[in-house]
């Protein structure tokens, strides 16, 4: 089993695009595991890079990393965010109507895809973040908070939010009726759109990321690499693979990863691997599956390595 001294984990929040299947919750631990168990001077290949959480964490830790994802839409979004400023980030928040218009639009620009990403439920780009009953109320409130207070985080401390969170507004009967129907006091809760913008701002502030040159290759393109560290986060076995561009053959991938393990350090993220040539080397006991179904919440994230004899 690999070791992890959690006292050495970088302080501060994890960074990366709010992306479906992102490893942001455990990215700091994964990179620290690499640092504590292997030669961190080796080049790290983040081959299924997704929203860039592992890549960004490597950069924050001063490690050399190659950011790759087969889907150029996600790497284009990543590069767009790190090249822009805070005022541009504010333009990404959109209403339900605008979301639906962009969703039907073809072709989509990088900014279009970012707007769908930030404003979609589960960051899956297809359905709006809030239900129909809530969408206008929460969107309008988020826009008002940005315009009046210029904040993404800490929005619950603004007078605008506190006022909106009250169940009654003296003298405004129609508003009171609406608030009562929605159960505003109990349900207003989080304004996820502002929280998403905060994540983008954290990413944008990492100037060192501008030096990255992302690639969009299939994993087989790295077959000739030797003497490196590979962090692999492929589509998991027996799960939906919406976030992966194209079909994915898990067994073919395991064959490739096993071969690569003979001349490289290869770490694979998964819940389980059916191929007996791989063994679990670390388990993130607090990072559980959020997938739907009977097994939801029971499976934990793990790291696997090949057993080379």
Segments and roles (model prediction):
Residues 1-45, 49, 53-54, 60:
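S-adenosyl-L-methionine
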Residues 5-6, 237-238, 243-309:
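Long, positively charged, glycine-interspersed low-complexity recognition regions
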Residues 61-209:
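Class I S-adenosyl-L-methionine-dependent methyltransferase module
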């Amino acid at each position: 089993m690999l070791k992890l001294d959690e006292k050495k984990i970088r302080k501060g929040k994890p960074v990366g695009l709010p992306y479906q299947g992102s490893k942001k919750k455990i990215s700091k631990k994964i990179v620290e595991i690499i640092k504590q168990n292997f030669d961190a001077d080796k080049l790290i290949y983040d081959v299924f890079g997704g929203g860039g959480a592992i890549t960004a964490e490597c950069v924050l830790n001063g490690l050399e990393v190659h950011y790759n994802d087969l889907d150029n839409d996600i790497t284009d979004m990543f590069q767009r965010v790190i090249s822009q400023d805070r005022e541009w980030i504010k333009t990404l928040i959109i209403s339900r109507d605008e979301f639906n218009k962009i969703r039907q639009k073809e072709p989509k620009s990088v900014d279009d895809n970012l707007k769908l990403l930030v404003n979609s439920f589960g960051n899956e780009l297809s359905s709006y973040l809030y239900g129909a009953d809530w969408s206008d109320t929460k969107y309008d409130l988020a826009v008002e908070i940005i315009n009046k207070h210029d904040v993404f985080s800490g929005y619950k401390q603004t007078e605008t939010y506190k006022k909106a969170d009250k169940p009654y507004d003296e003298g405004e009967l129609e508003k009171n009726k609406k608030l009562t129907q929605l159960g505003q006091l109990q349900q207003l809760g989080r304004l996820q759109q502002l929280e998403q913008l905060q994540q983008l701002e954290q990413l944008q502030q990492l100037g060192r990321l501008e030096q990255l040159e992302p690639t969009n290759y299939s994993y087989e393109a790295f077959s000739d690499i030797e003497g490196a560290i590979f962090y692999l986060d492929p589509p998991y076995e027996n799960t939906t693979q919406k976030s992966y561009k194209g079909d994915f053959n898990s067994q073919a991938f395991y064959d490739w990863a096993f071969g690569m393990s003979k001349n490289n350090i290869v770490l694979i993220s998964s819940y389980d691997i059916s191929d007996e040539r791989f063994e679990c080397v670390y388990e993130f006991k607090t990072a559980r599956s959020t997938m739907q179904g009977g097994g939801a919440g029971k499976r934990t994230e793990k790291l696997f390595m090949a057993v080379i004899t």
